[in-house]
Amino acid sequence: MWIYIVGGILLLFAAYLIIQIVRCNTAVKESKERLAVYGAETVDLSYGKMSYVDTGKGEVILSVHGIFGGYDQAYDTCKDFNSDYRIIAPSRFGYLGSDVLGDGTPAEQTAAYVELLDKLGVDKAYLLATSAGGSAAFRFALDHPERTKGLILYCSAMPFTEKPEKYPEYAGPPAFLCNDLTIFIMSPMFEPIMGLEPSTIYGMLPVSERKTGVVLDASVTNLDMAKNYDDYHVEDLKVPTLVFQAKDDKLVRYSDTEKAVKRIPNCSFISFESGGHLLEGHGEEIKEAVSKFINDCEKTDCLV
């Protein structure tokens, strides 16, 4: 009797797995077709290649994407601004066609961004960062204030209010989970764990082409503001900052952001009761606030 029960369970599991493999393979194929539409370019920098999207005209917004991102996520974050500004949306280290410089630290990512801007003939830019991209954005503004017009942060990683006594050695998904099928099967758990719709998976595929970046974020980027706390003296920022955060964000603690913004000079903080980590439902409000921020900054020459 038990043999039949166990056999039936194994048969059902095998059928489920086969269905998920077929669905995942289809989704990965469609994701690669989707990426081709972005018209990404690749540039040779001193250390290797960087892929990016460059579109629009006007003041430049350099988009710094989060974990499981790439030039697609970087561009999608800013696509509502495409008619008013020039959007430069590169893949960070290890994501979608971008090589890694040195250890892949935020400081090295900043150096790579400077090279990219030089190649594209851009003197100054606004940095718009989401989630894990916050560390590189802060590093850029601190290291290169002369190249920075302003910081715009969406549910971004934020500096600590005091030096942490300890921090994890790894802050992100384990490397063995970073493959297309595993993440695809786990996607129904996105909502209860991260507050993200399961459909978010379709913007993360192909995971196989983002894995190096994900592991780098978890082992280096996400730890940098804790590990090198003294190097993130954000009180010295020379440009204005605009921060957006939803109170129900499950990935970036709202209370931590509330405390962090008090360290930042000339910082405007806009919070939402809901919207989660992706600030869903607030597109028009955000677009209006960002446009006002840039317009005001241009009138004052972007000085704190």
Where do the model's predicted regions map?
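Short beta-strand/loop motif that positions the catalytic acidic residue
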Residues: 237, 243-245, 249
